[in-house]
């Protein structure tokens, strides 16, 4: 279980050539993600989704608030938490000179996967993500979809407890996207805790148990997809989101 309580992140930016001002990337965000749940973090580009997930993944420190993982926090149990996290960002760069297998082997070493289990784990992940045909190819020679599968595979070799997935299917074709979504659903059955950020509302509606809608760093609505559609008198999450913001997507 992941519990986010009153989390805020402030940055400074230039107001003009001489003056700076503070702005809120995320402002007083709270929610709980239970075991065996897929929680969608929804919103347009610039809404604060990535900043929020980077704080949950321990990459950024919140200005205010707390984040706990089954009672553990980064202040006292950072190593224990990070050993159980899978963090996927669409901006992650891979080592192009390595083969997929070599990269996954390296990730096994980083996460202290039992040496006798490394090849078994790599084979399992490759099979689930349908990577067998290019497992021994260099990453530099892969397609966009294949590269994203490797990016996901590197997060999985240590069998994480908590998934923090930021735009996992962006830029992928329909088949590759579906393989990844099917995998996420399978991990839910194993009682993993999954946070899934996307701006694809239809995708979230299909796989998420609950969603948290964010705009301009603030939570504007949370609940199951059905609850949100019912409360906004709409038939899909996209229309619900626009109803909640009054159709205004202007970014600060």
What are these model-predicted stretches?
Residues 2, 24-26, 82:
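Conserved structural motif at the start of ABC-family nucleotide-binding domains
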Residues 222-223:
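ABC ATPase "signature
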Residues 163-167:
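Catalytic Walker B motif of ABC-type/P-loop ATPase nucleotide-binding domains
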Residues 105, 109, 116-134:
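Conserved ABC ATPase "signature" region
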Residues 65-75, 80-81:
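Conserved ABC transporter NBD signature motif
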Residues 97, 138-142:
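Conserved ABC ATPase signature
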């Amino acid at each position: 279980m992941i519990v986010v309580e009153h989390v805020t992140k402030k940055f400074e930016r230039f107001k003009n050539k001489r003056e700076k001002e503070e702005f809120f990337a995320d402002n007083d965000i709270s929610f709980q993600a239970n075991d065996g749940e897929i929680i969608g973090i929804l919103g347009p580009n610039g809404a604060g989704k990535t900043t929020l997930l980077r704080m949950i993944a321990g990459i950024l420190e919140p200005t205010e608030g707390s984040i706990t993982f089954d009672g553990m926090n980064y202040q006292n149990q950072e190593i224990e938490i990070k050993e159980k996290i899978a963090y996927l960002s669409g901006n992650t760069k891979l080592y192009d000179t390595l083969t997929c297998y070599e990269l996954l082997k390296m990730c096994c070493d980083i996460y202290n996967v039992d040496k006798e289990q490394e090849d078994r784990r790599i084979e399992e992940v490759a099979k689930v993500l349908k990577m067998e045909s290019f497992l021994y190819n260099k990453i530099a020679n892969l397609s966009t979809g294949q590269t994203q599968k490797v990016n996901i595979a590197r997060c999985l070799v240590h069998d994480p407890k908590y998934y923090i997935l930021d735009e996992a299917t962006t830029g992928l074709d329909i088949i590759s996207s579906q393989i990844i979504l099917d995998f996420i659903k399978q991990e839910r059955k194993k009682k993993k805790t999954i946070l899934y950020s996307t701006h694809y509302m239809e995708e979230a509606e299909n796989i998420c148990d609950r969603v948290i809608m964010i705009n301009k760093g603030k939570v504007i609505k949370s609940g199951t997809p059905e609850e949100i559609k019912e409360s906004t008198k709409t038939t899909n999450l996209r229309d619900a989101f626009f109803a909640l913001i009054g159709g205004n997507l202007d970014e600060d």
